[in-house]
UniProtKB/Swiss-Prot annotation:
Keywords: Chloroplast, DNA-directed RNA polymerase, Nucleotidyltransferase, Plastid, Transcription, Transferase. The gene is rpoA. GO terms for biological process: DNA-templated transcription. Residues 1-233 are annotated as: Alpha N-terminal domain (alpha-NTD). This is DNA-directed RNA polymerase subunit alpha.
Length: 339
């Protein structure tokens, strides 16, 4: 059936989700095809996407737990079936869904006897638990049990040195890897000069995002990696010239908005969405979290407003500046702005 759909190598490159299912709350599966590809291209794309999916997708997890006066992680607490180490391992397995950046606080505070599950975690509004039935501990006696938690969004596997903290807090090895597994296979079709390849890509995720969302994020990350090479020829500058390249100082978006409103061309700012501005995935996500969706939303913010956004850096500010400079009319760029 696939061979009939891909008749020749001259056909436009297309992708399609051919299978999608939810095996459990913490196991999503998706199967995608990309075709038609020339010989060797399927392997190139498959390797790049697999690496990006397994190592470049961001995830949210619990990174620290504070128990109070507990001497070490191998201690046992009266009235609790599990040891501190077992509780830490259970917390490590909790799957969270969120777009937050930076560190956030959470907590558990319950009274026994009862089972403690992920549903008992008190989270900030921006964080959601994927599987509320995940076990944490079993209180066998009528005791008060409270834990302070730290939550962080990151990528990859982060480990911390084990040491005793005076305040009773213990680090949890963070596994910020929403994609559990990726497989790809290649099928050759056609004859002679019309021979081409079809890439099949299988993605399993932990439920914090769908395979389609993971594929989208991995693709954006790969595009961001190659953007500097695309812009190098446009800039027409050598490496020596780049050393002394001017970095714009602090600027005020409000002034630029005023200049835009005076522009005779009447640009429909509310019709230009930020995903049309070729922003990096990091800058794009920062703006989306701040409910900035259009160019009008962006230019309505002062620089102070932007710098207050979680994880918004000076590099993001410069990237936005360069993007606006690229997309705004030339006559507007000649206007004097307040710095």
């Amino acid at each position: 059936m696939v061979r009939e759909e891909v008749a020749g190598s001259t056909q436009t490159l297309q992708w399609k989700c051919v299978e999608s299912r939810v095996d459990s709350k913490r196991l999503y599966y998706g199967r995608f095809i990309l075709s038609p590809l020339r010989k060797g291209q399927a392997d190139t794309v498959g390797i790049a996407l697999r690496r990006a999916l397994l190592g470049e997708i961001e995830g949210t997890c619990i990174t620290r737990a504070k128990f109070g006066s507990v001497p070490h992680e191998y201690s046992t607490i009266a009235g609790i079936e599990e040891s501190v180490q077992e509780i830490l391992l259970n917390l490590k397995e909790i799957v969270l869904r969120s777009n937050l950046y930076g560190v956030r606080d959470a907590s558990i505070c319950v009274k026994g006897p009862r089972y403690i599950t992920a549903q008992d975690i008190i989270l900030p509004p921006s964080v959601e638990i994927v599987d509320t039935a995940q076990p944490i501990a079993n209180l066998t006696e009528p005791i008060d049990f409270c834990i302070d938690l730290q939550i962080k969004r990151d990528r990859g596997y982060q480990t911390e040195l084990r040491k005793n903290y005076q305040d009773g807090s213990y680090p949890i090895d963070a596994v910020s890897m929403p994609v559990r597994n990726v497989n790809y296979s290649i099928f050759s079709c056609g004859n002679g000069n019309e021979k081409h390849e079809i890439l099949f890509l299988e993605i399993w995720t932990n439920g914090s995002l769908t395979p389609k969302e993971a594929l989208y994020e991995a693709s954006r990350n790969l595009i961001d990696l190659f953007l500097p090479f695309l812009h190098a020829e446009e800039e027409g500058t050598s490496f020596e010239e780049n050393k002394n390249r001017f970095t714009p100082p602090l600027f005020t978006f409000q002034k630029r908005l005023t200049n835009l409103k005076k522009n005779k061309k009447g640009i429909p700012l509310n019709s230009i969405f930020i995903d049309q501005l070729e922003l990096t995935s990091r800058t794009y996500n920062c703006l989306k979290r701040a409910n900035i969706h259009t160019l009008l939303d962006l230019l309505s913010k002062t620089e102070e407003d932007l710098l207050r956004i979680d994880s918004f850096r000076m590099e993001d500010r410069k990237h936005i500046w360069d993007t606006l400079e690229k997309h705004l009319p030339i006559d507007l760029l000649k206007n004097k702005l307040s710095f």
